[in-house]
């Protein structure tokens, strides 16, 4: 058996073990213990030409919405984004993401799954699927820190003249991926500092060509000012490396006004 086939076999076994473990524990969660929900709607704009690198992509208007629900046994989070609203329909793009942590053996270890889809009328469409394991044990009054590791399966419409489509195994998302939140008060005003970060490793050849690198970085650092009970203003430093169709490191600044519910 070739090394490539052995790798595919190992990946398949890991997926099967992960799914079987999650399914095995699902009957125990037929009556979930509800903890709470959260969500928000936001509107604003992103400036690709500010930040540390001028990517020469201009300013884009955007709207976003997110919703999450937490149980003792599992957590679910979803996100929607519509971009480039100041351009004609042909130049707009839309993003939908759904993510979950399901606790294993009543512990802080979790089955982790994420589906991320992007539909772009001018560049291309892709659907990314991550599955692996996470951890929910790091949280407190200071906020939370939720790492996860996983395999990456990708489906896209990019076709390389040399390597073919990007579809199929697309490497890994490994240990240095997190979501963190830190609430604090300054001058009697409430703020929240949050960060998400993903590093993609060992991409397939076609996706490597499309994104200009075998590995890639994708993330955002946000500070939100809770200036009224349900209203907030936020600034995000969005950073990426060999991602979003950009060769090398790039960034943008995002300015949003939002309503929490």
Regions found by a protein language model. Give the residues of each.
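Outer-membrane beta-barrel transmembrane domain signature
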Residues: 152-230, 239, 259-261
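Membrane-embedded beta-strand positions of outer-membrane beta-barrel proteins
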Residues: 39-43, 67, 78-80, 111-113, ...
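Outer-membrane beta-barrel "beta-signal"
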Residues: 249-261
